[in-house]
Amino acid sequence: PLLFSGKSNRKSIGEFIFGFSFLFMGLSLLKTNAPDLSRNPEMLSFVQNYTDMGFGSVILFVVIGTVLTMIVQASAATMAITLIMCANGWISFELGAALVLGENIGTTITANLAALTANTQARRAALAHLVFNVFGVIWVLCLFKPVTMGVSWFVEDIMRTADPAVAVSFKLSAFHTTFNICNVLILIWFVKLIEKTVCKIIPQREQDEEYRLRFIT
């Protein structure tokens, strides 16, 4: 009923609930229809061949997460795939965390592709998003072991999650949350620097009208 309401506020609430419901329906379909690698030993062997290369595996899975998110164009969908793979024991939590880092880069690249035909301000915002997340991935990779060990300690010892399948889901969620919160707390002090860098890379075009808020003096 909210979708057909004459009032814009109610209609917006209805559209929000409708879209949110479809998001979870899509995630449920992904989980239900995800291929079972245990029944496909060739594919499982292919995946596991690249899980024991040390830090090289971490870098590889960051790249895989980036490319996969660019193809799917939905970080929520790739996050669901990551949760399924870790919960079923196909990859470790550390490699799942690497996929999450890649997903954070991939979701910004899709925004940059969408902004190619937009105005200067939109392209600057998309580039700033990319810079923000790439910097976050770099510093987390430098502290990858301490960060993943800290998340594991929190979930296992503080939250006392016994079931491994549930624990790894909590770990990935906690890792994703920690990544974004810490990245904001670090980069909030460098907003001006990021702005200057982005404006230098993408200069103002003559045909673009400078954006101003209307009715606000």
For each feature predicted by the language model, list its residue ranges:
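Hydrophobic transmembrane alpha-helical segments of multi-pass transport and channel proteins
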Residues: 104, 108-109, 130-142, 173-193, ...
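Membrane-water interface regions at transmembrane-helix termini and the short interhelical loops
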Residues: 2-12, 115-121
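Helix-loop-helix hairpins and the membrane-proximal interhelical loops
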Residues: 16-67, 85
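Non-transmembrane accessory domains of multi-pass membrane transporters/channels
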Residues: 181, 188-217
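The feature identifies polytopic integral membrane transport proteins across all domains of life
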Residues: 43-46, 59-64, 91-100, 121-127, ...
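Transmembrane helix-bundle signature of multi-pass membrane transporters/permeases
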Residues: 18-21, 25, 66-72, 84-88, ...
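Membrane-interfacial helical/loop segments at transmembrane boundaries in membrane proteins
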Residues: 38-53, 57, 148-169
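Membrane-interfacial helix-loop connectors
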Residues: 1-2, 31, 69-106, 115-117, ...
